[in-house]
Every structure is written in structure tokens, then in C-alpha cells.
Amino acid sequence: HNITYKIGYYLHLNNPKEWAFIILFSIIASLFFVFLDKLVLVGFQKRKIWSDTKYPIFNYFIWVITSVIFILGGTSVGYFISPDADGSGIPEMKTVLSGVPIYRYFSFNAFVGKSLGLFAVLVSGASVGKVGPYVHLSCLICTRLMKSNYFEKIDKSTSIKTTMLSVACATGITFALGCPLGGVLFSIESTASIYMVSNLWKSFFSSVICCFIFKMFYGETII
């Protein structure tokens, strides 16, 4: 019994609701990222079909024009939907995890704007990384889930809420990079000035679930 207690204390298993939240969040976030990836792939394939005509010069102009249209659409979401959708996401999350709140950074409009903006820019073929946006989107999903009635105690506790946001950062980076251990370590490096070691197990657990769902949908694709 003493050994079981020590293991439970070391792994911080004394709050089952936190682990239930991590499992549910990891599944929802991973499914959303898979959906977004599939949507980007479909959009890119549609662009290839549109530019596949008998005339090479038309193909070139159609490809360039559609690329410009998607880029303009992706960069306009900050103006038309939410200014909080602009930027990477990692510097802002580092600020939030340091204890400085950013007004409306986790709003629903920011989620819609970030999703549409990332989709449009990736479909355009622009050389834009997914790590920062996935961190922001992951934290947006985490925040929305914490607002539910069942997990309202997590949302009301500043320390637990910060822990869950750090877990969300690790999940977003893991899905973008495809590496659970590396994603967790990189999330510590990029988003935290002071890191609670007790959060390491939770972040790694969420990242493993993320990779498992990735494997389910992408099969033998290397991750």
C-alpha cells in the first residue's frame, strides 16, 4: 500500500478528473488536427486539379492566382474575424503561462480565425510552419473544454489551468512535429521560463495519445 501511494503521489494520480480531462482533450484536439490536415490536403489537391488544363501558360497563371487568393484570405482573418488569430502562438502562450493574461486570446473568434487562416495559408503553398498555430489552436480547444460544467473546477483553479495549458502546448507541438518526447521537451523550452516537473508526465501522456490517434488515421506513415 505504501509503495502504491508513493507511485500515485509521484505520478500525481490523486486527481482523476485532471487525467480524465487530459484524455478527453487529447482525443478532441488530435481529431481536430487530423481533420484540419485532411482538409488542407483536399484543398491542395483541388488547386492541382484547377490548374491541370491543356495549356501550360494557363496552368501557371491559375496556380499563381489561386495561391495569391488563399494567401490574401489567410492573412485577412486578423482584420475580419479576430486580431488574436494573427501571429505564431508560442510567444503569446509563453506570456500566458508566465501569469500575464491576454484579453480575448482564447475567444471563439480567435479559434475560427486561426483555423481558417492556417487552412488558407497552407493550401496556398506558402512556406509556413504549423508548430506555432497548432500550439494556439490546442490551447484554444483546451480552454473551451475547461469552460464546460464538468470541468469548471479546473477552469477556476489558476494552477491547474496553467498545467492544462502547458499540456496543450505539448500536444500541439507533438502533432506538428510527430514526436511525443521531442514535442514535450520542445514545449518546455519554447513556452516555459519556469517549468513544474510534475507536469511532465501529464504532457507526455497527452502526447502519446496524440501520436496513437495520428497512427490510427495515417497508418504506416512515419511519425
Annotate each PLM feature.
Residues 1-223:
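Alpha-helical transmembrane segments and immediately membrane-proximal extracytoplasmic
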